[in-house]
Amino acid sequence: MKYGVVLFPSKKLQDIANSYRKRYDPNYALIPPHLTLRTPFELTDLEAAEVVSTLREYAKNASPITLRIKKFSSFAPVNNVIYMKVEPNEEIMALNERLYADPLEGTPEYAFVPHVTVAQKLSDDEHSDVLGTLKLRKIDHEETVDRFHLLYQLENGSWTVYETFILGEEG
């Protein structure tokens, strides 16, 4: 089964993201706005149990994460994804790094850029128009997220929460 690890931002930030996603993101119906901490990976049921135990330890030893967003950006020319750029901080970078260690071993395909996607799979012209409009929009958002989630993918392509991990909490 395919799994992934994400942070879900506040409803306020999700509403901002969704105001664009419903028009510009074909994955809008498959997963709420999120910040991907670990790209999707395959696990058996037995491996999933081990990973849950490991993630519980990671969470216990981590602190809540501050998300600061001050602008929209894009991964162009690599791809036409437009996102709200989350300013990197020690907590989020450390958690991302841990999520590629044992037992979740793997090598990220790209350098980790904390972000919340608002548009993807756009034509070059549409990407240019949407990004130009969003870069004119002021955004100054800060919030603290105290949990992350292990998700799994259903047969229809949508993602659902398998387990939630509270940052800095025993248990």
Curated annotation (Swiss-Prot):
The motif HXTX 2: which residues?
115-118
What's the Enzyme Commission number for this chain?
3.1.-.-
Q: In which residues does the motif HXTX 1 occur? A: 34-37
Q: Where is the active site?
A: 34, 115
The protein's name in its UniProt record: Putative phosphoesterase BPUM_1117
Q: Which keywords does this chain's UniProt record carry?
A: Hydrolase
Q: Which domain of life is it from?
A: Bacteria
Q: InterPro entries from the entry?
A: 2H_phosphoesterase_YjcG-like, Cyclic_Pdiesterase, YjcG
One Pfam family linked to the record:
2_5_RNA_ligase2
The record's PANTHER family line, in alphabetical order, gives:
PHOSPHOESTERASE SAOUHSC_00951-RELATED, PHOSPHOESTERASE YJCG-RELATED
Annotated GO MF terms: hydrolase activity, acting on ester bonds
Family statement: Belongs to the 2H phosphoesterase superfamily. YjcG family.
Coiled-coil region: none
Against HAMAP family, the record matches this protein to: 2H_phosphoesterase_YjcG
